[in-house]
Swiss-Prot record:
It holds the Pfam family DUF5485. InterPro entries: DUF5485. This is Uncharacterized 6.4 kDa protein in HE65-PK2 intergenic region. The lineage of its organism: Viruses, Viruses incertae sedis, Naldaviricetes, Lefavirales, Baculoviridae.
Amino acid sequence: MYFTSRFLSALGTSNTLAVRCMTVKMNAVDAELYRPRFIFCATSHFVRHTTLFTLS
């Protein structure tokens, strides 16, 4: 019984570690996907503001 509980707790720990690793990887993938879009949006926003400022 003791070994079974130890094994289950070890399994639970490795599972949480794997889930955490997956979450970090997904966050990194999201950042990689969204970074160009964010840069594009920020650049177009900045260009729009400067264009309006120069025109006015």
